[in-house]
Amino acid sequence: MNQQKSTFIFILTLGILSMLPPFGVDMYLPSFLEIAKDLDVSPEQVQHTLTSFAYGMAFGQLFWGPFGDSFGRKPIILLGVIVGALTALVLTEINSVGNFTALRFVQGFFGAAPVVLSGALLRDLFSKDQLSKVMSTITLVFMLAPLVAPIIGGYIVKFFHWHAIFYVISLVGLLAAALVFFIIPETHKKENRIPLRLNIIARNFLLLWKQKEVLGYMFAASFSFGGLFAFVTAGSIVYIGIYGVPVDQFGYFFMMNIVTMIFASFLNSRFVTKVGAETMLRIALAIQFLSGMWLILTALLDLGFWPMAIGVAFFVGPNPVISSNAMASALERCPQMAGTANSLIGSVRFAVGAIMGSLVASMKMDTAAPMLFTMGACVVISVLAYYFLTSRNLKSRG
């Protein structure tokens, strides 16, 4: 019983760690207009603070993986969580959007450490079958963050100052750091640690870039995520600023998208062993493609809020299915470099998301069209990358 209890607390701690990035992103979405007013800038400039966080996550995923292999998992995870929490506190004292954007990059960069190294820590401890079960549990905990964070953020903005959002983010981060310190063991033994050799790291990344199929899956997942991040970047301005959704109600509309993601993930877990990752990936891409075309149509015909909101939910829903199955298919083709591939794909995924978010943020948001066209374009690129870069062996993989 004690062993079961300690395992539960261990998994719960990792689940809380996995919640930190979505808390850092989703909780302050309802506050964009308030931040813009407070800093005397346009809402579009505030959007760049979100894409800056994503750029930090992209670079951090390349950086922290090798450091964790060299210096151990626990100290790097602690460093990332503590710096992220302290950065959230500093953000409450910032009165310049430029400094705010720079600090969000720092927060994303250090926030990547627990994301990358939690997975490595799990691989140190669990067998393949156990790992799958543990990851399913952690995913359920992770899904709570984007489900509740925008709702919490909306009520905080309604009743308090937007600074309070970052106090909460900092408090959650410090709580996570305490849990890591007292509960998480160091799993990467000193005799297994790998010295930092940049030439070997660079060589492995280059080898992956030369594998056509790996690129196909990577870009399929990355541009699917890019479409999602275009919505995350601009969604609050579109819903609140353009369609007049009350700030404290935005989280409930955002929740609709998370529910479709959870439902899609559930269906994937039920059927992927029966029909295969490749089939589930194709189905998810097809649903997202049709949803993307519908969103473009709603923009062209100005169909209003609900047709757009429902289309967004169906667009966002397949994203975890695309991501998980594309990742599994890519790693299957480079098992000897699975860690490097995981780091590279995660980095490219956030980089594409940041670029798409920056693209949307650079456009004038008088209507929802810039966001919707960007989402539609992303899924087109995703489908084309999958079709042209992985098509040679589709028949043999069935």
From Swiss-Prot:
PROSITE patterns cross-referenced by the UniProt entry: MFS (PS50850)
Transmembrane segments: 8-28, 52-72, 75-95, 102-122, 137-157, 164-184, 225-245, 247-267, 275-295, 296-316, 343-363, 369-389
GO molecular function list: sodium:proton antiporter activity; xenobiotic transmembrane transporter activity
Recorded superkingdom: Bacteria
Family that this chain belongs to: Belongs to the major facilitator superfamily. Bcr/CmlA family.
Protein function: Involved in sulfonamide (sulfathiazole) and bicyclomycin resistance. Probable membrane translocase.
Protein name: Bicyclomycin resistance protein homolog
Organism for this UniProt entry: Haemophilus influenzae (strain ATCC 51907 / DSM 11121 / KW20 / Rd)
